[in-house]
């Protein structure tokens, strides 16, 4: 990030962490509305404001912003540079074709570096695990691993 981007990110994080609800709640609601818009292929209705929804929105926004101000606690290319630590394990990478948060090229690069990984591209999905196609692919992958890892039937 360049200086001005860090200033925006850091100042937004400060607003989310401000103890005054008049400061942190509008920021948290906006954060979550933006994330909802980016993470799903089809427009979603934002949840109504309630005490429970506000608590969830605030905790989600603070947690995600904390990761961003700490550069996700990763060095540049750390995952791909250390992929050899897990290439002996089987994996399924579920990717939404219209994911603008983690674009498909990132999943393709991961699978190219991980011989035992299988890529499942979901044509009608973005990023969210709550989208029907992503959810079905995740459940299917889990079922395949359950079968693969279960002891043989007697």
Show where each model-derived region lies.
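Active-site nucleophile elbow and catalytic-triad environment of alpha/beta-hydrolase enzymes
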Residues: 66-83
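Short, small-residue-biased leader/transition segments that mark boundaries at the very start
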Residues: 1-8
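Accessory cap/linker subdomain of secreted extracellular hydrolases
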Residues: 12-48
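Catalytic active-site module of serine/aspartate enzymes centered on a nucleophile-bearing elbow/loop
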Residues: 117-154
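Small-residue-rich helix-loop
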Residues: 46-57, 83
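Conserved alpha/beta-hydrolase "acid-adjacent" motif
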Residues: 75, 100-106
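Active-site-adjacent alpha-helix of alpha/beta-hydrolase-fold enzymes
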Residues: 104-117
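Short beta-strand/loop motif that positions the catalytic acidic residue
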Residues: 86-87, 93-95, 99
């Amino acid at each position: 990030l360049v200086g001005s981007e860090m200033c925006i990110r850091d100042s937004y994080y400060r607003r989310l962490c401000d103890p005054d609800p008049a400061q942190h709640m509008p920021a948290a609601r906006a954060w979550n509305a933006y994330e909802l818009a980016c993470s799903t292929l089809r427009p979603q209705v934002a949840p109504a404001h309630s005490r429970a929804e506000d608590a969830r929105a605030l905790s989600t926004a603070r947690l995600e912003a904390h990761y961003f101000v700490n550069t996700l606690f990763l060095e540049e290319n750390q995952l791909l540079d250390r992929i050899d630590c897990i290439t002996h394990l089987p994996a399924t990478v579920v990717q939404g074709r219209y994911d603008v948060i983690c674009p498909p090229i990132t999943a393709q690069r991961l699978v190219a570096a991980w011989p035992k990984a299988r890529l499942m591209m979901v044509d009608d999905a973005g990023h969210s695990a709550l989208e029907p196609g992503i959810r079905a692919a995740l459940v299917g992958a889990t079922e395949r691993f359950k079968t693969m890892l279960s002891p043989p039937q007697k």
